[in-house]
Curated annotation (Swiss-Prot):
Pfam families: Glyco_hydro_42, Glyco_hydro_42C, Glyco_hydro_42M
Source organism: Thermus sp
Protein name according to UniProt: Beta-galactosidase BgaA
EC number: 3.2.1.23
Temperature dependence: Optimum temperature is 70 degrees Celsius with ONPG as substrate. Stable for several months at 4 or -20 degrees Celsius in the presence of 10% glycerol. Activity increases continuously from 30 to 90 degrees Celsius and drops dramatically at higher temperatures. Retains 50% of its initial activity after 1 hour incubation at 70 degrees Celsius. Retains 90% and 50% of activity after 30 minutes of incubation at 70 and 80 degrees Celsius, respectively. The residual activity of the enzyme decreases to an undetectable level after heating for 30 minutes at 90 degrees Celsius.
Name of encoding gene: bgaA
Length: 645
């Protein structure tokens, strides 16, 4: 199904009914609204103006639209900030952030918790049983604009309490953090400060605990709202819209309190921000990288335990990337179908009409500010017609499982040991290779059940907890583990048995030395798939296992014991492709090399093919299959769907 984000408070009331009628005529079923409307609902303290929202919801019901109502807590009004200035967050440089944007609150603020409880309870009590309201979105894009980690006095006190609960005694904390180093020993939890503004780098264990604490604070704030909504809005779903390429919080943990996950898909903006070579950014400037949206669909399907929405889908140029090109004709339709192929229950577009004012006036919508339709309007009209004629089977399991860990991103942010080491870059490289091989990927948190997958990929897992080791030991298929896995304990220390730590139960080897390589300094390796150049990262390994791939100086780079493999370097694109292709063939997954820009996705017996490229491509469909959308020749920025039994 399809939906759209709408802001009735931005438009004259006489437009509302006309807009809702146009939404239904377009084929939209859902409308999200209200997530930034606190000042419109309560312009002065206690003076609640529900009337306009009452009328909006009644009109939506009349026109057959289902409403996802946002809690308005991402934008506390000016009067609230003036009354409680301490709710404003403090940045890493110790500066109090000002009113005038959005997300201007601290998750640890007691005053803001109280005000949140008041407005959310009032909203849920009034609309939790309204027939138009089918669900709630909690807040909006937790952590956007760098707001997960705050450095205010409230956070300091909350962090001290978090540490007391975790460690019990200050001696336990000192041992865990190794505070004997640089004379950092604490006598009491009340002496612990937030890890910022230090002369030299802060203690990495201190930083990691603070990152964990900050993520936990967001989760607690979300759960706090969820509980209020559950109490007052029976039978309504609750979700939150996560972001792309964002690791400051743990989405798997937060989503445990939601009915499903949602995310905001802006393929062009994300591609412009990705650490890609400039030629690739130009190549995909109007389409988005072929794997950027798919990666997040699969990630948030995993986060949502099999269920996800796209709450905001890009319909035109955005306003927040360094460069903001317009999508190529056909791409809004392609992105929509791709989300559906990956299992999205709803694709909702941002926004119905481009705002003529304020910060997002340069961000396109379905309609221009003069009320005339934009290009995306007609592409979505076509999708709605196609959807009505194409029954969709349930999405099944993929053949490849990938283990994703936000904590790993935190570890490498704190201690990268090399400027080019980026966790998400490594993860995305693995994911993208399997997409180029025509294979689907399911994404899991560490410790999730991995049975039934022919191939399990762990790009890097520095902290290997007991449940993660158990899940890997019980996996049915081949398991490939990437560099720096098992390199730290939960306390952010080198494990006593040295890396890969607990993974030595599966892979009897020791990483005895590591190095990071600057750009241009390359090592060469050779093996059964050819000769490859390596950069970024290398490890020296002691083991009795024979290496499958060697550096030219004799050091091993790839080791195997039974079903388990360890990769002791940052893989070059060429090696990664050859390795993953070989493992997929061994696992019986039938990989195939797709033309550049072509991607496949199965949904039950349906096979979707998406052409991100500028040329016509041939659909890799068996002879005689029936095409349900398109045909064997797929034009640029188009798709085809066929059925395979």
């Amino acid at each position: 199904m399809l939906g759209v984000c709408y802001y009735p408070e931005h438009w004259p009331e006489e437009r509302w009914e006309e807009d809702f009628k146009a939404m239904r005529a377009l084929g939209l079923r859902y409308v999200r609204l209200g997530e930034f409307a606190w000042s419109a609902l309560e312009p002065t303290p206690g003076a609640l103006r529900w009337g306009w929202l009452d009328r909006v919801l009644d009109l939506a019901q009349k026109e057959g639209l289902a409403v996802v109502l946002g809690t308005p807590t991402a934008t506390p009004p000016k009067w609230l900030v003036d009354r409680y200035p301490e709710i404003l967050p403090v940045d890493r440089e110790g500066r109090r952030r000002n009113f005038g944007g959005r997300r201007h609150y601290c998750f640890s603020s007691p005053a803001y918790r109280e005000e949140t409880a008041r407005i959310v309870a009032l909203l849920a009590e009034r609309y939790g049983r309204h027939p138009a309201v089918v669900g709630f979105q909690v807040d909006n894009e937790f952590g956007c604009h760098g707001t997960v980690r705050c450095y205010c006095p409230n956070c300091r006190e909350a962090f001290r309490g978090w540490l007391r609960a975790k460690y019990g005694t200050i001696d336990a904390l000192n041992a865990a953090w190794g505070t004997v180093f640089w004379s950092q020993t604490y006598r009491d939890f009340g002496e612990v400060e937030l890890p910022h503004l230090t002369v030299a780098e802060a203690n990495p264990s201190h930083l990691l605990d603070y990152y964990r604490f900050a993520s936990d604070q967001v989760r607690a704030y979300n759960r706090f709202q969820v509980d209020l909504l559950r109490d007052n809005a029976p039978g309504r779903f609750i979700t939150h819209n996560f972001m792309g390429f964002f690791t400051d919080l743990d989405p798997f943990a937060l989503a445990e309190d939601l009915d499903f996950a949602a995310w905001d898909s802006y393929p062009l903006g994300f591609t412009d921000l990705m650490p890609l070579p400039q030629e690739e950014k130009v190549q995909w400037a109007r389409t988005g990288h072929p794997d950027v949206a798919a990666f997040h669909h699969d990630l948030y399907r995993g986060v949502g335990r099999g269920r996800f929405w796209v709450m905001e889908q890009q319909p035109g140029p955005v306003n927040w990337a360094p460069h903001n090109p317009s999508p190529a004709p056909g791409m809004v339709r392609l992105w929509t179908w791709e989300a559906i192929a990956h299992g999205a229950e709803v694709v909702s577009y941002f926004r119905w009409r481009q705002a003529p004012f304020a910060q997002e006036q340069m961000q396109a919508g379905f309609n221009r500010p003069d009320f005339q339709p934009e290009v995306a309007f007609f592409e979505v009209q076509r999708v709605a017609e196609e959807l009505s004629a194409l029954p969709l089977p349930p999405a099944g399991c993929a053949p490849v499982a990938l283990v994703y860990d936000s904590e790993a991103a935190w570890v490498f942010e704190i201690q990268p040991q090399g400027a080019e080491w980026k966790y998400l870059t490594l993860v995305f490289s693995f994911y993208s290779v399997f997409r180029r091989l025509g294979l689907e990927v399911d994404i899991f948190k560490p410790g999730a059940e991995l049975g039934g997958y022919g191939l399990v990929v762990v790009p890097s897992l520095p902290i290997v907890r007991k449940e993660a080791l158990e899940a890997l030991s019980q996996a049915d298929g081949l398991v490939i583990v990437g560099p720096r896995s098992g390199s730290k304990t939960e306390k952010f220390q080198i494990p006593p048995e040295i890396p890969p730590g607990a993974l030595q139960a599966l892979l009897p080897l020791k990483v005895v030395r590591v190095e990071s390589l600057p750009p241009g300094l390359l090592e060469e390796a050779e093996g059964p798939w050819g000769r490859f150049a390596f950069g970024v990262w290398r490890e020296w390994v002691e083991t009795d296992l024979p290496p499958l791939l060697r550096f030219t100086d004799g050091g091993g780079i790839l080791f195997r014991r039974g079903r388990y493999l360890y990769l002791a370097a940052w893989p070059s694109p060429e090696l990664l492709f050859a390795l993953c292709q070989s493992l997929a063939e061994e696992a019986g997954l039938h990989p195939r090399f797709l033309p550049e820009g072509l991607r496949l996705r199965r949904r039950g017996p349906l096979v979707f093919a998406f052409n991100y490229g500028p040329e016509v491509v041939e659909a890799p469909a068996p002879p005689g299959v029936r095409f349900l959308l398109g045909d064997r020749r797929i034009p640029p920025h188009d798709l085809a769907v066929w059925e395979e039994t």
